[in-house]
Amino acid sequence: MAPNIRKSHPLLKMINNSLIDLPSPSNISAWWNFGSLLGICLITQILTGLLLATHYTADTHLAFSSVSHICRDVQYGWLIRNLHANGASFFFICIYLHIGRGLYYGSYLYKETWNIGIILLLTLMATAFVGYVLPWGQMSFWGATVITNLLSAIPYIGQALVEWAWGGFSVDNPTLTRFFALHFLLPFLIVSLSIIHLTFLHESGSNNPLGIISQSDKIPFHPYFTTKDMLGFTLMFFPLLTLAFFFPNFLGDPENFTPANPLITPPHIKPEWYFLFAYAILRSIPNKLGGVLALTASVLILFLSPLLHASKMRSLTFRPMSQLLFWLLIANLLILTWIGSQPVEDPFIIIGQVASFTYFFTLLFLFPITATLENKILY
């Protein structure tokens, strides 16, 4: 019998083992769709980004006008720009749900995959931040000023670091140029990290909703999960296109319709919605260095998840007490997101401080304590 080229060709064999004949647990739910959705988000962002980069000018005098030119004069430029801006929001929605799935079902016990995933999240956050500066509107400029200025809280080398990042003594043309270079470069780093992420995942195989070994019940990835992923793509593109066509500025900030002006500070400087939870944690501590440390810890705390796992069961499926705690954590993050969008005044200050404390306390203490308690009850 003639050898199947899909299984014998060196390149096709890799694709086959990753996307076609990959043995997958038979019971993985829709929560396992977000990996492929993140892949399609990344491809969409790179394609729309490349098209935008061909018309964009990374110069403080021309950046704002060039974005306006893209939307007015370039064929379907308005659509490409709207897809790129709102695609970033969907990227973050998918990655947050993907991380939430990992926390709920204990996927973080695949330590290598989990750690690369967190590095991916940090790279994505960096990419989104430098990208937000490029239109050179008011919120772009002041967001860049405020966030990069946080580096000055680092003892001894802080001020030098800020001036090095800015390329001068304030956010200006050198800053915009290097941010454009970084925004162009980082997505390709995300692609390579994603390949490493998948390599580690395929070493162990996927987890499943029951959190049990599924070696005895695997099915091929194609056609079952390729079809399921296609449905996921459709369900994601529908709201993305609805947003891009009908409500393109719904998630944006009105301040960004005003060209950057170093002499006028907007009344409320705030980042895009997907950073608001971390911004609320930053603002909840009335000390600059403390705030920066809390901001960093709010994401880096995810590295501790495998170390803090105290339960004898992997998933939360059969652990109602931990489930309640998990949903309280989600509610807490939503409160932080809301607080991040509010001005710094009572009662928002105290709500933010309580929510920030609860966030760290839940992850560091309540989850391990509850898991130990459940072990006592169940075993």
UniProtKB/Swiss-Prot annotation:
Transmembrane regions: 34-54, 78-99, 114-134, 179-199, 227-247, 289-309, 321-341, 348-368
Domain of life, source organism: Eukaryota
Locations listed in the record: Mitochondrion inner membrane
Database matches in PROSITE patterns: CYTB_CTER, CYTB_NTER
SUPFAM superfamilies with a match to the protein in the record: a domain/subunit of cytochrome bc1 complex (Ubiquinol-cytochrome c reductase), Transmembrane di-heme cytochromes
Pfam hit, one: Cytochrome_B
Cofactor descriptive note: Binds 2 heme b groups non-covalently.
One of the GO BP terms on file: mitochondrial electron transport, ubiquinol to cytochrome c
UniProt key word Iron: yes
Keyword Metal-binding carried by entry: yes
Membrane topology according to the record: Multi-pass membrane protein
Residues engaged in binding heme b b562: H84, H183
Keywords in alphabetical order: Electron transport, Heme, Iron, Membrane, Metal-binding, Mitochondrion, Mitochondrion inner membrane, Respiratory chain, Transmembrane, Transmembrane helix, Transport, Ubiquinone
Binding-site residues, heme b b566: H98, H197
Cofactor(s) listed: heme b
Ligand binding (a ubiquinone): H202
GO cellular component: mitochondrial inner membrane; respiratory chain complex III
CDD domains cross-referenced by the UniProt entry: cytochrome_b_C, Cytochrome_b_N
MF (Gene Ontology): metal ion binding; ubiquinol-cytochrome-c reductase activity
Note: Heme 1 (or BL or b562) is low-potential and absorbs at about 562 nm, and heme 2 (or BH or b566) is high-potential and absorbs at about 566 nm.
The family this protein is said to belong to: Belongs to the cytochrome b family.
Assembly: The cytochrome bc1 complex contains 11 subunits: 3 respiratory subunits (MT-CYB, CYC1 and UQCRFS1), 2 core proteins (UQCRC1 and UQCRC2) and 6 low-molecular weight proteins (UQCRH/QCR6, UQCRB/QCR7, UQCRQ/QCR8, UQCR10/QCR9, UQCR11/QCR10 and a cleavage product of UQCRFS1). This cytochrome bc1 complex then forms a dimer.
Function: Component of the ubiquinol-cytochrome c reductase complex (complex III or cytochrome b-c1 complex) that is part of the mitochondrial respiratory chain. The b-c1 complex mediates electron transfer from ubiquinol to cytochrome c. Contributes to the generation of a proton gradient across the mitochondrial membrane that is then used for ATP synthesis.
Name of the protein in its database record: Cytochrome b
Organism: Tinamus major (Great tinamou)
